[in-house]
């Protein structure tokens, strides 16, 4: 499998996705447009690039931690999933989580980061029950959403 990612620059006025530092897992994605996000509002923002994720891999679009902590800018469907067959422009659903202050995103601002990872493409097999399929019970069982505790004050 190649260690490269094919990128089409759809907007020649923007830089290609890039790593801020050597060894960073993600590459920064840039906004291709000016956007004003009022408090609590979201917008689908173009990045000006398309990528060809290799088969057996997935692209995951994550928020930039600095934007989330400093101004409350995040991604609605975090992480966003880019399947290997998608060839269109990458777009990011940004949301302003600040309760009072609008966020201004300028063309060329770094708005998200793209990570590309291997993914297991498992075959789905229908079973009537996990017991009948020979899948052992676990200590967790069907306990979800808060089943492990840890927040006595909430």
From Swiss-Prot:
EC number: 3.6.1.23
GO process annotations (BP): dUMP biosynthetic process; dUTP catabolic process
Cofactor entry: Mg(2+)
Keyword Hydrolase: yes
Catalytic reactions of this protein: dUTP + H2O = dUMP + diphosphate + H(+)
UniProt xrefs under Gene3D superfamilies: 2.70.40.10
Pfam families in UniProt: dUTPase (PF00692)
Key words, A-Z: Hydrolase, Magnesium, Metal-binding, Nucleotide metabolism
Function: This enzyme is involved in nucleotide metabolism: it produces dUMP, the immediate precursor of thymidine nucleotides and it decreases the intracellular concentration of dUTP so that uracil cannot be incorporated into DNA.
Stated name of the protein: Deoxyuridine 5'-triphosphate nucleotidohydrolase
